[in-house]
Amino acid sequence: MGSNLSPQLCLMPFILGLLSGGVTTTPLSLARSQGSCSLEGIEIKGGSFRLLQDGQALEYVCPSGFYPYPVQTRTCRSTGSWSTLQTQDQKTVKKAECRAIHCPRPHDFENGEYWPRSPYYNVSDEISFHCYDGYTLRGSANRTCQVNGRWSGQTAICDNGAGYCSNPGIPIGTRKVGSQYRLEDSVTYHCSRGLTLRGSQRRTCQEGGSWSGTEPSCQDSFMYDTPQEVAEAFLSSLTETIEGVDAEDGHGPGEQQKRKIVLDPSGSMNIYLVLDGSDSIGAGNFTGAKKCLVNLIEKVASYGVKPRYGLVTYATYPKIWVKVSEPDSSNADWVTKQLNEINYEDHKLKSGTNTKKALQAVYSMMSWPDDIPPEGWNRTRHVIILMTDGLHNMGGDPITVIDEIRDLLYIGKDRKNPREDYLDVYVFGVGPLVNQVNINALASKKDNEQHVFKVKDMENLEDVFFQMIDESQSLSLCGMVWEHRKGTDYHKQPWQAKISVTRPSKGHESCMGAVVSEYFVLTAAHCFTVDDKEHSIKVSVGGKKQDLEIEEVLFHPNYNINGKKEAGIPEFYDYDVALIKLKNKLNYRQTIRPICLPCTEGTTRALRLPPTTTCQQQKEELLPAQDIKALFVSEEEKKLTRKEVYIKNGDKKGSCERDAQYAPGYDKVKDISEVVTPRFLCTGGVSPYADPNTCRGDSGGPLIVHKRSRFIQVGVISWGVVDVCKNQKRQKQVPAHARDFHINLFQVLPWLKQKLQDEDLGFL
C-alpha cells in the first residue's frame, strides 16, 4: 500500500473402471516405429496419424469435419505388417484418406414425410419432418447435420395414440422391425453394415405404457460424444437416481435439493470406483483417470452428498483399496487420499485386462454373508460407472457379472416391480480403440436415458466431469467455482466485485468487494466517505461492463478513520467493513456466485462438518493457531490473479503485527495494539514464504481460505505497511516488513448477522 498509509484498493453407488487405448501422440514428421511394424507407406491423405500402445496400433487423425477412410485405426500384426485397409463391404483400399463427414439419411419414416430427400447430407444441411392427417409429431420437426456426423435434436415420430405404448420411432440411420404397440409387443432395430448399434436392439411394450430399454442409434467408428453431450445426458440420468433416493428419505425432489442430499447413517448409496491398471491404459491415462475421480469425489462431497465408496484397481487381478463396509468409506477426504496413493506400477507384473474379475470384486462388496440380506438392503441404489475400451483379454465376458449383480439385487424379476431404478451401469469408452459392441452390452438400457458414452481422449473426459458437475441447480451454493481451463477470470472468481467511486474535482477511487448474497457486496468502509452519493458509486460483477444500481452503503457503526487523530494516529482502520446493498437482485450464473461467510450453514456444509457445528468450531477449522494458507485476488493487466499468502496466526503473529510501526504515520506509536486491534489478521513478510502484497486497488477484496474445494472469506483487505505497487506496477523486491492487514470477519459477525438477516444465509 501507499507510503502515506493510504489504504489498499480472489451420491450414489458408482463403479468406475478405466481401460483406455494408451495414446501417444506422434507427429508424422517425427514418427518412429516403436513396435515391429514399419511406418513406411502408412500415411493418410489430408491428415496425420498417431501411435497407440507403444507402436502396436495407430490412429488416423483428420481435420474437423472430416473422417479417416476406410478405417480409423490399424493394428500391428504378428507378421510385422499393419492390418489391411478395408471398407465396410470388405473391399481393399491402397491408401487411407480424409473424407468429408456426412450424416445418414432416414431409412424409414412412418406416417409422415421428410424433406429434402438425399442419399446423404453434408454438415449444416437441414431436414424437416411433418405428419399425415390424424398423426401428431413428437420430437424435433427440424434437424441439422452436425460436424460429428450426428443429427441435432430428437427423433421425429408421428403417432396417432392408438397403441397401448406410444410409437417408439425410428432413429435416423436405423431400421425397425415391428409395427404393433400392444402390451408385451416387441420391436427390433438394425444398423447398416459397418455401423454399430448403441442402445437397445429389442424393446418391449411394458405395463404403464413405457418401452423397455433405451432408444438405439447407429454409430460409425469415427463418431464421438462431445463433452457437453456426455455431461448433459449423464447428469440428467444421475439426477433421476438422486431424486429417487431423496424421495425415499421423505423429501420432495425439489430443484434445490438435487445436489444437497445428506444420506442417513444407514446409507442408501454406495460408490464403487474401479480403475484399470493394465498395459492398455498407459501411465498417463491412469493418472488422468485418477484426476477425474478425485474431482468427482470432491465435487460430490461439496454438494453435501455422503455416499459410501469402494475403490478397486485391476489388471490381471483386482486389488481392493477401500471397502464400502469400512468406517471411513463415506469420508471423501480419506477416500481421496487413498486414491492419490495408488500407483500405476502396482499392477505392473500382472498387466492383463480382466474386467470380469474387477466386477466380481464389486459384486463381493455388494453381497452379504450367509445369503441373509441385511435390513434395508432393497433401499440401496447402485450405480456402476465403468470407463473402458471394452477390450478385455482374459477372464471371460464381464456381462455375466452384471447379470449376477442384477440377480442379487432382485432386478427385472417382478414385472410389476422390476426395481430397475436400483442399478445403473454407465460405461465410458475412452479413445479410438473402443469396442462399441462390448461397452454397449455392459451399459444399462433405460427409457429416455443414455448410459453408454464414447469420448475421444482423457482431455475430453476431464471436460465431461467439469461440465457434468457445475449444473445450474448448484449456483446458489457458496464458494464454488468453475476451475476448467476454458473458464474466464470470473468463472474462477465468481464472487469478485469491482467498485469505483467518483468524486467531483477529486478523481475516483477503486476498490474490490465480494458477493455474499443476492443483494449484498461486502467491502471495506474506507473506500467511501460520508459525502459519497449512491449514484457516484459503481459496482460491477461477473466481468460485465454494466454497473449495478446502489440502494445504500452500510458502514460498521464502530468504524471511524479519524477516531484517534488526537492521539497522533492519522488514520485508524478498526472495523473497516461495509456492505453495499443493491437495488436489484443478482441473477446467479457461473460467473456470478456468492462466497462463503464464516458461521453460516452454507460454510458448515462446505467444510463437510456435522450440522451441529458451532461458530467456534468453524473458527478452529478455518483459523487455527498456526500459519494459515490463504489467498486474495488482485487485478494485473486487466486480469484477475490469485495471490497465495499466509495468515500469521501462530508464533509469527506478534512479529507480523509489530511491523505495522514501519507504516507512515505509525512510527511514533508506542503500543502497536493502538493501531493493530484484535480485529485484524496479518499477512506478508518472508516467512514461512515470501508473501505477495496487496495493492491500492485491492482494498475491500476478500481474504480467502480455500478448503475442500470451496472458498470461504475470512477477512476484508484493509491496509498495508508498504506501497509495493508504485507507478501502477507491482515491485518484485520488497522489504521483509511489508505487511498487510485485514479485518477478521469472525470479529464483526454480530453486525454481519444483523445486516444480512433477511438473506437466508443461516447464521449460526
UniProtKB/Swiss-Prot annotation:
Annotated Gene Ontology cellular component terms: extracellular exosome
Main location class: secreted
GO molecular function: serine-type endopeptidase activity
The record's note on its domains: The unliganded VWA domain has an inactive 'locked' conformation whereby the scissile Arg-259|Lys-260 bond is protected from proteolytic activation.
Annotated EC: 3.4.21.47
Domain of life of the organism encoding this protein: Eukaryota
Transmembrane domains' residue ranges: none
Lineage of origin: Eukaryota, Metazoa, Chordata, Craniata, Vertebrata
Peptidase S1 domain residues: 477-757
Active site: 526, 576, 699
Disulfide bond sites: 37-76, 62-98, 103-145, 131-158, 165-205, 191-218, 478-596, 511-527, 599-615, 656-682, 695-725
Short name of one Pfam family: Sushi
Keyword set, alphabetical order: Cleavage on pair of basic residues, Complement alternate pathway, Disulfide bond, Glycoprotein, Hydrolase, Immunity, Innate immunity, Magnesium, Metal-binding, Protease, Repeat, Secreted, Serine protease, Signal, Sushi, Zymogen
Stored InterPro entries: Compl_C2_B, Peptidase_S1_PA, Peptidase_S1A, Sushi/SCR/CCP_sf, Sushi_SCR_CCP_dom, Trypsin_dom, TRYPSIN_HIS, TRYPSIN_SER
GO biological process: complement activation, alternative pathway; proteolysis; response to bacterium
Protein known as: Complement factor B
